[in-house]
Amino acid sequence: MFDAKIKTLALITMSLLAPYSYAQERPTHRIVGGSAVQAPSWMVAIGNHVDNKWDNYCGGTLIDKDWVLTAAHCVEGSRLSGMQAAIGVTDLSKRHPRSVVDQIIMHETYRNNFVQNLGSNVEDIESDIALLHLRTPSTNGVLAISDRDSTSDYQKGRSEFTAWGYGGIDPDATLSSPQLLSVNLTFQGFKDLWTFTPTQTHIFAGGVVGKDTCQGDSGGPLTDQHGLVGVTSYGGNRCATGQAGGYTFAPMFRDWIAEKMNSVSITNHQLVSLPAGQHTWVSYTVLNTSPDSVTLEGFNTDAPALLNECPNSLAPGAKCNLKVRFDANFTPDTYKLYKLSINALKPNGSSQRLDASLVAITTKKPDTGSSIGGGSSSGSGSHSSSESSSSSSSGGGSLGLFSLLLLPLAWRRKL
C-alpha cells in the first residue's frame, strides 16, 4: 500500500514559487513582437470548461489524428474533467469547435520529479513534455516531428524557427491576444542559458529584444521547415528582454512519443481542489492503443476508495475508467498526495506497471450561504460528453482552477 502524504498548502505553494526566488529571470512564454497569422491545421489551444466558460491556458501541436503534444507543466495543475482542445483556430474570441481530451500522459521523469519535489524549493524541468489523447480523432492535418535530432543540425545565430501562440503580447504579460500570433526566433544552442549547463532535453531560441514567447504560449510549437522542433517550456519573468527561451527538444522524445501512442496508458497525474466537508470521485482513463488485448490486475491505491469500472481484459482501442475517491476532510489549505497503480499483462507474458498521482487539496468552506454539492462527480465532467463549439475568453485565458497556487508555472509560459 502507498503512504499518502499530507502537506500544507503553504509548502506546496512554496515549492512552486521558490524556483523563481533564485531565478527571477525564469518563467513563461507568450508571443511578443510577432504577427497575426492564419492558424495552421495543427495548431492547438488547450483549456478547461469551468463555470460554463472555456478558458485556454496553454498551446499544443496536433502530431497525430488522436494526439496533441504539449508541455508537462501545462497539465501538472489540471484535472482531466472538462479539458478540451481547440484545433486550427485563428481567433479564439470567435465561435469555434473544440475536441474533448480523454487522456493525459505526463512524461514519467517530469511527473516523478514534480511529485518528489512537492513541498520543497526544488524544481526540475527535465522532460517537460506531455501527450493528450483526443476522444474523437481530428480530421485536421498534423505536423510531423523534425527528424533533425543532432546538435550539428543547427547553427547558432543562423538556424531559424517560428514560435506560435495565443499568449501574452507585452513583456509583463498583462495583455494577451485571442488571435494566433507567430514570431521568428534564431537558434541559441543546447546550453541552458539560465544555469549555463548543457542540457539534452531543451533547445534554446530567441535572444533578441522585443521578440519572444511568453505566458500562455507554454506547450505551443517551435517549428522550422522540417517540422516540430520544440515545445515552449520556460523563459524570463519579463518576456522579450533579449534572453533566449527554453523549448523542450521534441526530436529527442520521438521514441517516447511513439511508445505512448502505441501502448497501454493511464491518466498519470491530476490536481483537484475541493471545499472542506465535500467529496468527489476523480476519474482516471485506462487506454489501450496497443495492437493486443491486455489483462488488468493488481489495482492499488492509498486513496480512501477505488471504484473499478474496467473489465478484466481491455481490447485494442478500448478504454475504461478507474475512479479514486477524494474526501476533503483534512485541514483546509493542506493537500494529500495519493498514488494509484495497476498492472497490464500482455499476451507474451510481460507486465507493464501503470502509475498515477493525485494532488488532492482541501480548501476553506465558501463564505456564502449557498451550498456546494458534495455528491460524487466523475472525471469525465459534464462538458466532456460531447464535442463543443463556443467562443472563449480572449488571450491566454483566465488563471482557472487553482492557478493562483500554480502562478509561477504561468511564468513558465502557462496562464
Task: Go through each PLM region and give its residues.
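Chymotrypsin/trypsin-fold serine protease catalytic domain
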Residues: D91, S99, I125-V209, A250-P251
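Conserved catalytic-core segment of clan PA serine endopeptidases
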Residues: E25-A39, Q84-T139
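Protease-domain processing segments flanking chymotrypsin-fold serine proteases, especially trypsin-like
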Residues: F2-S15, Y20-L69, S78, Q84-I87, ...
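C-terminal subregion of chymotrypsin/trypsin-like serine protease catalytic domains
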Residues: A36, Y57, T61-E76, S177-D192, ...
